[in-house]
Amino acid sequence: MLLGQLSTLLCLLSGALPTGSGRPEPQSPRPQSWAAANQTWALGPGALPPLVPASALGSWKAFLGLQKARQLGMGRLQRGQDEVAAVTLPLNPQEVIQGMCKAVPFVQVFSRPGCSAIRLRNHLCFGHCSSLYIPGSDPTPLVLCNSCMPARKRWAPVVLWCLTGSSASRRRVKISTMLIEGCHCSPKA
């Protein structure tokens, strides 16, 4: 997913969600936390979203606890009650955009049977990146699944010296490897 699409998603989640009237809720004059402005509703069949959202959840643990409580109460909703509670998405926009991905230096060893080994300083991409899945009525749900991937890379030749049939002669074997210079969170290809 492109950064522009992610920004659009975050803008939608930050106050442009519809209220019970179907119109976007007007911005309140007092400042509020990002989480308090991002509401979603668990709707039963034929239920309308409530006009007043519940207060913000503080953590994933509270969110998951609410999910369990809602699963226990699903029998009531299926028996005809239209009562639905608002659920706050516990998303921090900085956590969604920013991942912990970096290039970690290591010494890579290249060798082949009968050849002398060569050591080359390289980098590997290591860290965690955010992922997101938003279900909806659209057959293609919004999915963001980032991986820690090379941002700057180049191919470099590596020369190995290998022995031939006689111990006195050697030949060059040229191979190439990718040298990683930097990493970032990027959608999986």
From Swiss-Prot:
It comes from the Eukaryota. Residues 101-186 form the CTCK domain. Glycans are attached at N38. Expressed in the retina, in inner segments of photoreceptors, at or close to the outer plexiform layer and in the ganglion cell layer (at protein level). InterPro entries: Cerberus (IPR016860), Cystine-knot_cytokine (IPR029034), DAN (IPR004133). Pfam families: DAN. It is found in: Secreted. Transmembrane segments: none annotated. Residues 1-22 form the signal peptide. It is linked to Heterotaxy, visceral, 13, autosomal: A form of visceral heterotaxy, a complex disorder due to disruption of the normal left-right asymmetry of the thoracoabdominal organs. Visceral heterotaxy or situs ambiguus results in randomization of the placement of visceral organs, including the heart, lungs, liver, spleen, and stomach. The organs are oriented randomly with respect to the left-right axis and with respect to one another. It can be associated with a variety of congenital defects including cardiac malformations. HTX13 inheritance is autosomal recessive. Antagonist of the extracellular signaling protein NODAL, which is required for correct left-right patterning during embryonic development. Antagonist of BMP and TGF-beta signaling. Independently of its role in left-right axis establishment, plays a role during heart development, possibly through the regulation of TGF-beta/Nodal signaling pathway. Displays anti-angiogenic activity by inhibiting endothelial sprouting, migration, and proliferation. Once internalized by endothelial cells, may alter their redox and glycolytic balance. Belongs to the DAN family. This is DAN domain family member 5. It comes from Homo sapiens (Human).
